């Protein structure tokens, strides 16, 4: 599996002829460059232009299968589970809702629904936290086996702080931790919290299941 990072919460995972995009960036985003590659599956965690650009993951006549929201899915033999969590990313403080976003996206606790996705791809289990801003996960998710890889947001208004991001990553006991939604300051703080100031920094990451053997909470930084 090959992993690349494309700003914000956008991650591309490719193996063989299959490409999955997590959090594709829309052309309407004011913060990040829109996604510019084709994908077979697009996972949408949050109904916000920074993360709902499934149309940008289309190429020619090929359109991705879009997974958007909690539930159980199976696409091309890949089982995907989505779990409802909370995010306040991109909310208008005066209304507690993002501009132009439907009230159905609002949680009962305030904020918006952020879907955390769990799946196994190319023999590697992945947990993608999206734009989550809470450290308490749904019971069903907490009871699952430890993931091989967790993608965790560490900066941006409305997501976890670097400190909370590290606490959640530690609790999840993932073999590999990859930060998303980071800037230089928040990344530095997150790496300090994790005791990984000398973490490996790469433009793309190629992994096989055997590469994860013996790893415990190792942080790798993917450059956009």
Regions found by a protein language model. Give the residues of each.
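Binuclear metal-ion centers of metallo-dependent hydrolases, dominated by the metallo-beta-lactamase
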Residues: 4-6, 176-224
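Active-site-proximal beta-strand elements of phosphoester/diester hydrolases
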Residues: 2-5, 20-23, 77-85, 118, ...
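Proline-aspartate-enriched helix->loop->beta-strand connector
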Residues: 39, 149, 156, 165-182
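Short acidic-hydrophobic surface loop/beta-edge motif
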Residues: 11-13, 69-76, 119, 207-212
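Short Gly/Ser/Thr- and charged-rich N-terminal loops/segments
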Residues: 98-101, 105-109
């Amino acid at each position: 599996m090959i992993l690349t990072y494309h700003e914000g919460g956008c991650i591309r995972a490719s193996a063989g002829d299959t490409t999955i995009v997590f959090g594709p960036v829309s052309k309407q985003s004011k913060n990040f460059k829109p996604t510019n590659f084709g994908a077979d599956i697009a996972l949408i965690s949050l109904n916000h232009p920074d993360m709902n650009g499934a149309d940008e993951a289309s190429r020619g006549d090929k359109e991705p299968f879009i997974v958007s929201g909690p539930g159980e899915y199976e696409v091309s033999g890949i089982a995907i589970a989505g779990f409802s969590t909370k995010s306040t990313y991109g909310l208008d403080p005066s209304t507690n809702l993002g501009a132009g976003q439907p009230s159905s996206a609002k949680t009962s606790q305030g904020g918006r629904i952020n879907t955390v996705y769990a799946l196994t791809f190319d023999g590697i289990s992945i947990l993608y936290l999206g734009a989550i801003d809470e450290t308490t996960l749904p019971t069903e998710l907490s009871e699952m086996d430890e993931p091989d890889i967790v993608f965790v947001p560490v900066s941006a208004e409305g997501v976890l702080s670097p400190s909370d991001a590290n606490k959640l990553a530690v609790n999840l006991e993932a073999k590999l931790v990859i930060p998303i939604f980071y800037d230089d300051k928040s990344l530095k703080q997150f790496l300090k919290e994790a005791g990984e100031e000398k973490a490996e920094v790469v433009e793309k990451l190629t992994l096989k299941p055997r590469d994860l053997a013996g790893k415990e909470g190792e942080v790798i930084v993917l450059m956009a």
